[in-house]
Curated annotation (Swiss-Prot):
Cofactor(s) named in the record: FAD
Cystine crosslinks: C59-C64
GO biological processes: cell redox homeostasis; cellular response to oxidative stress; glutathione metabolic process
Species this chain originates from: Eremothecium gossypii (strain ATCC 10895 / CBS 109.51 / FGSC 9923 / NRRL Y-1056)
Protein name (database record): Glutathione reductase
Assigned keywords, A-Z: Cytoplasm, Disulfide bond, FAD, Flavoprotein, Mitochondrion, NADP, Oxidoreductase, Redox-active center
Length: 480
C-alpha cells in the first residue's frame, strides 16, 4: 500500500506535466516585476509571478534598502562627533577612535527588516490576486516557461504576455590572480564582522557609497580607482567635491591604479593587494564594486529574444523585445538601473497591455530622471551634465549658475562638510537642463526640484520662487 506522502509525490509529479496558461507571466520578483504584475492584476488580468530568490530583488535584499540603513548608521556616527560642538554630551569623551559599532548586532536588525519587507511584498501580491510561484524559470525549446521548484519538481507555463524582469548581478574581474579572495557588492551584506581594513575596487556609486559607510564606521578604508575622481559618470562638480572630501575625511584613494593580484596569508587570512605601483598589506576584506551585468539564466535564445553586445536584453521604447509578446525592463535591459525607473516602466507596461484604451500608448520617459548617491555628503543629479549640455547645445548656448558654501549646520563645528549647487541652463529662455547638488540633505532636496525640471522650468521660474530661510536649498532659487 502506498503511503499518503508517496501518493502526494506521484500526483505532484503528474501535475507538473500540465501546462498552465495566464494572461500575464512575470519572470522576476524585483521592484519592476512586482509593480507590473500587481498593476496587471488590478485590471483583472490572470497574472503569475515567478521568483527563485527572496522577493524584492536587488533593491530590497542587497541594494538600496540595506545600503541606506548602513548609510544611516555611518551618518549618525558622523553626527555623534558633532555633539560636543553643539553643547551636548560634554562629559563624554567622544572621538572616532572610541566609537564602537556593533556590526554583527546591527546586521541582524538590518536583515530582520529586509525579511519583513519580503513578507510585505508577498502579501501585496496576494492582495492584488497575483499568483506567486517560488522557483527558477527558463524558456524551454518549445517556447514555454519551465519552472524548477526548490524540491526539483518542474512546472510548465505559457502566457499571452511575458515580462522578463530578472534584474542584474555584480561583475567580478577576470584574469586577476587571487580575485576570488574578495567579495562582490552583494557579498558586502553577508559580512559577519566589520573589517578593520578594507580595499574597495571601483569608482561608481556603489563603491563610493561603501567607502563612505566603512570610513564613517571606523574602518581603515582604501578605494582603488582608474582615474582621478570617483563618480565619473556624474557631473565634474560632484566628482571633484566628493573625491576631495573623502580624502579630507581619511579615505585612502589610490588614483590611476588597478589591482594586479591578491595574495592571502594561510595563517592569518589577511590579504595583500598588489596595485600597479604599490602594495596594500594586512587587508581584512576586499570588495569588488566594478559594475553589474544582466541576470539571464533563463535561456532567452530559445524564444529568439535578442541581446545586445553587453548582454542586456534589447528593447524598444515600449519595452518590447525582438519576440512578439515578450517584454523586458529594469536592470536586465541596462538602461537606467534605478528602482523607481523599473517600477514606473513596469506599471506603464501593464497599463498599455491591460489598462483602459486611453493608456494603450503609455511608455516610460527616460529623460530627466533624478538620481542620488548616498555618499558623505550626499550627491544628487538630474538632467544633463555640463559636458553633455555643451555637446547637445554648444558651449555658447548654455549658462552655468553655481555656488559653493558651508551649510549653516557647520557654523558651530570645526569639522566642515562642503555644499555645492550647479544649475545648467540652455537657450535664450534659460531652460533648466541640469541640476547637480552636493551636500547634506541632497537626496530630499532633489525630489522637489526634479518635478520642476521635468515640467520644463526655466531659470526665471526658479527665481520667482520665494526662498525658504534659513536653508541650504534656498541657494538654488537665488543663484546669480
Amino acid at each position: 500500500m502506498l503511503r499518503c506522502r508517496e501518493v502526494y509525490n506521484i500526483c505532484k509529479g503528474a501535475m507538473s506535466n500540465e501546462v498552465k496558461h495566464y494572461d500575464y507571466l512575470v519572470i522576476g520578483g524585483g521592484s519592476g516585476g512586482v509593480a507590473s504584475s500587481r498593476r496587471a492584476a488590478s485590471y483583472g488580468a490572470k497574472t503569475v509571478l515567478i521568483e527563485g530568490k527572496a522577493l524584492g530583488g536587488t533593491c530590497v535584499n542587497v541594494g538600496c534598502v540595506p545600503k541606506k540603513v548602513m548609510w544611516y548608521a555611518s551618518d549618525l556616527a558622523h553626527r555623534l562627533l558633532h555633539a560636543r560642538d553643539y553643547g551636548l554630551l560634554q562629559e563624554v569623551d567622544i572621538s572616532k577612535e572610541k566609537l564602537h559599532f556593533n556590526w554583527k548586532e546591527f546586521a541582524g536588525k538590518r536583515n530582520a527588516y529586509v525579511e519583513r519587507l519580503n513578507g510585505i511584498y508577498e502579501r501585496n501580491l496576494a492582495k492584488e490576486g497575483v499568483e506567486y510561484v517560488h522557483g527558477w524559470a527558463r524558456f524551454n525549446s518549445e517556447g514555454q516557461v519551465e519552472v524548477t521548484r526548490p524540491d526539483q519538481t518542474t512546472e510548465k507555463y505559457t502566457a499571452d504576455h511575458i515580462l522578463i524582469a530578472t534584474g542584474g548581478e555584480p561583475v567580478l574581474p577576470e584574469g586577476i590572480p587571487g580575485a576570488e579572495y574578495g567579495v562582490d557588492s552583494d557579498g558586502f551584506f553577508r559580512l559577519e564582522e566589520q573589517p578593520k581594513k578594507v580595499v574597495i575596487s571601483g569608482s561608481g556609486y556603489i563603491a563610493t557609497e561603501f567607502a563612505g559607510v566603512f570610513n564613517g564606521l571606523g574602518t581603515e578604508t582604501h578605494i582603488v580607482i582608474r582615474k582621478d575622481h570617483v563618480l565619473t559618470k556624474f557631473d565634474p562638480s560632484i566628482q571633484e567635491i566628493v573625491t576631495e572630501h573623502y580624502e579630507k575625511e581619511g579615505v585612502n584613494i589610490h588614483k590611476k591604479e588597478s589591482i594586479q593580484r591578491v595574495e592571502k596569508d594561510p595563517n592569518t587570512g589577511k590579504l595583500t593587494v598588489h596595485l600597479s605601483g604599490k602594495i596594500i598589506e594586512d587587508v581584512d576584506q576586499l570588495v569588488w564594486a566594478i559594475g553589474r551585468k544582466s541576470l539571464l539564466g533563463i535561456a532567452p535564445e530559445n524564444v529568439g529574444v535578442k541581446l545586445g553586445e553587453t548582454g542586456h536584453v534589447v528593447v524598444d521604447e515600449y519595452q518590447n523585445t525582438s519576440t512578439k509578446g515578450i517584454y523586458a525592463l529594469g536592470d536586465v535591459v541596462g538602461n537606467m538601473e534605478l528602482t523607481p525607473v523599473a517600477i514606473a516602466a513596469g506599471r506603464k507596461l501593464a497599463n498599455r497591455l491591460f489598462g483602459p484604451e486611453q493608456m494603450r500608448a503609455q511608455k516610460q520617459d527616460y529623460d530627466n530622471v533624478p538620481s542620488v548617491v548616498f555618499s558623505h555628503p550626499e550627491a544628487g543629479s538630474i538632467g544633463l551634465t555640463e559636458p553633455q549640455a555643451i555637446e547637445r547645445y554648444g558651449k555658447e548656448n548654455i549658462k552655468i549658475y553655481q555656488t559653493k558654501f558651508t551649510a549653516m549646520y557647520y557654523a558651530m563645528l570645526e569639522d566642515k562638510s562642503p555644499t555645492k549647487y550647479k544649475l545648467i541652463c540652455a537657450g535664450p529662455e534659460e531652460k533648466v537642463v541640469g541640476l547637480h547638488i552636493v551636500g547634506d540633505g541632497s537626496a530630499e532636496i532633489l525630489q522637489g526640484f526634479g518635478v520642476a525640471i521635468k515640467m520644463g522650468a526655466t531659470k526665471a521660474d526658479f527665481d520667482s520662487c520665494v526662498a525658504i530661510h534659513p536653508t541650504s536649498a534656498e541657494e538654488i532659487v537665488t543663484l546669480k
